[in-house]
Amino acid sequence: VKVELDKKVQSLQDEVAFLRTNHEEEVADLLAQIQASHITVERKDYLKTDISSALKEIRSQLECHSDQNMHQAEEWFKCRYAKLTEAAEQNKEAIRSAKEEIAEYRRQLQSKSIELESVAWHKESLERHVSDIEERHNHDLSSYQDTIQQLENELRGTKWEMARHLREYQDLLNVKMALDIEIAAYRKLLEGEETRFSTFSGSITGPLYTHRQPSVTISSKIQKTKVEAPKLKVQHKFVEEIIEETKVEDEKSEMEDALTAIAEELAVSVKEEEKEEEAEGKEEEQEAEEEVAAAKKSPVKATTPEIKEEEGEKEEEGQEEEEEEEDEGVKSDQAEEGGSEKEGSSKNEGEQEEGETEAEGEVEEAEAKEEKKTEEKSEEVAAKEEPVTEAKVGKPEKAKSPVPKSPVEEVKPKAEATAGKGEQKEEEEKVEEEKKKAAKESPKEEKVEKKEEKPKDVPKKKAESPVKEEAAEEAATITKPTKVGLEKETKEGEKPLQQEKEKEKAGEEGGSEEEGSDQGSKRAKKEDIAVNGEGEGKEEEEPETKEKGSGREEEKGVVTNGLDLSPADEKKGGDRSEEKVVVTKKVEKITTEGGDGATKYITKSVTAQKVEEHEETFEEKLVSTKKVEKVTSHAIVKEVTQSD
């Protein structure tokens, strides 16, 4: 290795030496060249003039080029500057217009900002006002709600008070009805005492003229009073509805509308019946005139034409009995509906039958007295024809007297009749005593009267089953009371006995079916019979009716509850003494169950009673239509017609 390295070192050293020699040679060459160049320069110095001229030419050429370039640059600059100045002027105008627009926009912005501030202020004020209004509204609403609650409480209390008053009013009506019945009984008793006293005093002090003339007038009126007492027709309707609802005021208005509609229907039906009965009344009036003429010719034989007509009237009686059976069938159906109500009045039925039995005996005695008196006075009437004519003129004027249109006004004819009644007490009592004596002397004639009563009573019932036929017939009787008196006294005197017999038959057939609804009418009749005792009440009532005329006839139509059916009925009631009208108008009872007052019961009772003579039948229908949301109604309708 060392050898090799030595060899390398040796070779390298040789190479370095070679390179050094080459380098030195090159340097020498270069130095030689430099030296040679200096020599050339020096040679060139002789040509310096030529170079300067060349340089001058070049310099002149370059200056020409530079001048040209300078001139071109200036021209270009000027053109460019002119263009820029023109553009600047145009931009200035645009800038000016832009500045003006900017100023305008600034002014608008300022005005809008001011307006916005005002609107914002107004908005705030409105919001404050709205908040105030809402607060006030809430306050008012709360106050109104409190007021409504208070008014509802007051209304509820008022309704309770109204219900209490209605109950009290119903109780007072019941008491009033009982008092009216009792007053009527006492009135009959007083009238009987007055007539008996007048008859007694007339027989002592008065001459023949004083007691003969009243006897004729009595005979003209007996037919009305005799028929009136034993003949009662009752139609009783009771409607009880329990209605559960929340709107009581709507129901009241509906009930009032229904009642007004019913009243209108009744008025229309009454007018139609009145027209029909006027035509029939004219025919009956003509027949009555014929009978009067026959009575003048043969007053003693007044009963003979009745005996001849007996056979034809018996057939009519059979038909009437069939009609009564049909009515009893209807009564039985109605009695089943109101059975619970009818059981309570069974005692009154038995008492009434006893009263009717007593009434029959009294009527027989009265009829015997009247028949005997009629025969005794028949000859005297012919002699006293002139005073009788005066009585005729006086009585039609009474019949034409204005009829009161309300039950309050009916008291006036009663007072007038009582005044006239006091003047002739003595004469009437004298006539009654003579009748009693005549009844004892003629028992045979009483038997004949009983036979004639049956056929005579049947056509009367047919004529009077429409209420208005009897009005026309009675109007004719009132117009000519003195003429009809002689013959009618015998005929009408026979009617009460037959009618009371029929009442007993009807009472036995009706049985327990008629007990409840006929309670009021039986009490009235029983009191009349019990008070008058020996049947004098009916006999004493006849002369009183004679003196009072049509004014007294209207008094017979007793309107218990202060309500009449219609003006048409009132006018006809003034012309006839055979009708008694008892009408109880609607009575509403409002009760509230529970403290909240949500459930309310209204009890409406409508009671209509028609008390008529001559077996009259007057049917009054009540139609009540209810249209209410959520209505529960229970209705009990009881309609009973009794043939007394």
Swiss-Prot record:
Residues 329-350, 369-400, 422-470, 485-508, 545-557, 568-582 have a biased composition (Basic and acidic residues). The keyword RNA-binding does not apply. Glycans are attached at residue 217. Residues 1-197 form the IF rod domain. Its main location: cytoplasm. Neurofilaments usually contain three intermediate filament proteins: NEFL, NEFM, and NEFH which are involved in the maintenance of neuronal caliber. May additionally cooperate with the neuronal intermediate filament proteins PRPH and INA to form neuronal filamentous networks. There are a number of repeats of the tripeptide K-S-P, NFM is phosphorylated on a number of the serines in this motif. It is thought that phosphorylation of NFM results in the formation of interfilament cross bridges that are important in the maintenance of axonal caliber. Phosphorylation seems to play a major role in the functioning of the larger neurofilament polypeptides (NF-M and NF-H), the levels of phosphorylation being altered developmentally and coincidentally with a change in the neurofilament function. It comes from the Eukaryota. One of its GO terms (cellular component) is axon. It holds the Pfam family Filament. Residues 77-197 are annotated as: Coil 2B. It comes from Oryctolagus cuniculus (Rabbit). The lineage of its organism: Eukaryota, Metazoa, Chordata, Craniata, Vertebrata. The modification Phosphotyrosine is found at residue 105. This is Neurofilament medium polypeptide.
